[in-house]
């Protein structure tokens, strides 16, 4: 691994970083056995609350879910997203909200979407002993319609911007960076020049680690992006279980004597 940052010393330097999202204690306990980093992502706005984008997620939502996930983690690094509107307007607002999230959730770090435009804010957070994971490439908080999500890096101007963003967040003090929805060629370039761990999501296997939304991995959603492999189809399995339960209740087969007090 390319960083000697204290936060990453407990992580393996010889294998890619395994990262997933969690939004409740139960899932966090399971992930903690396998993940280096667990993210309480603002994707919970979509996968928990049914929103079409992440833009309506509030700081209170992130704090409540962060507290729940913290209860389930013993060894993984816990990172919490700063939601849209909590850090972009000013560094002072960002610091105030970052301190609040970190204090209440007891997370190890915060994740901020953006590159050069928020480098000053990143510096201030880091100076105040708030570790920052950056997020460059596709930035969902800036997109009002998920249908507008696209792959970046095919145009020279996109490549230049992303590389510039990388250098900016590095210099500002971020300990790692999420790189989302870029071409394999650009991901390879970013990974080679980066001095901090690059965690990919839709950014090929060239990165130092990978992150997915856990609900995508488990096959719980109606539709997943191309880069998200469904390792299981829990949606179908849950439907089958509920169908069996419904049938047993209607036929008065449940609860049977095995599930009844005497």
Task: Name every feature range the model reports, one short phrase each.
Residues 1-232, 236-262:
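Alpha/beta enzyme core
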């Amino acid at each position: 691994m390319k960083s000697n940052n204290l936060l990453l010393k407990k992580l393996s330097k010889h294998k890619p970083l395994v990262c997933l999202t969690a939004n409740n204690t139960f899932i966090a306990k399971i992930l903690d056995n396998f993940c280096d980093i667990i993210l309480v992502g603002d994707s919970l706005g979509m996968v928990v609350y049914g929103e079409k984008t992440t833009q309506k997620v509030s700081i209170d939502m992130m704090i409540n879910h962060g507290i729940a996930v913290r209860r389930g983690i013993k060894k993984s690094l816990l990172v919490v997203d700063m939601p849209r509107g909590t850090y972009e307007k000013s560094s002072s607002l960002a610091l105030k909200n970052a301190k609040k999230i970190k204090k209440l959730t007891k997370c190890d770090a915060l994740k901020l979407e953006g590159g050069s435009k928020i480098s000053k804010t990143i510096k201030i957070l880091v100076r105040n002993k708030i570790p920052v994971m950056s997020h460059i490439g596709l930035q969902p908080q800036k997109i009002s319609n998920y249908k507008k999500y696209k792959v970046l890096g095919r145009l020279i101007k996109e490549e230049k911007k992303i590389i510039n963003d990388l250098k900016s967040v590095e210099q500002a003090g971020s300990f790692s960076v999420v790189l989302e929805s870029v071409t394999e060629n650009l991901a390879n370039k970013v990974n080679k020049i980066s001095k901090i761990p690059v965690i990919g999501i839709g950014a090929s296997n060239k990165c130092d680690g990978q992150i997915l939304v856990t609900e995508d991995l488990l096959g719980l959603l109606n539709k997943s992006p191309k880069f998200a492999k469904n390792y299981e189809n829990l949606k179908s399995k849950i439907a089958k279980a509920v169908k069996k339960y419904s049938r047993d209740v209607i036929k008065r087969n449940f609860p049977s004597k095995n599930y009844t007090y005497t």
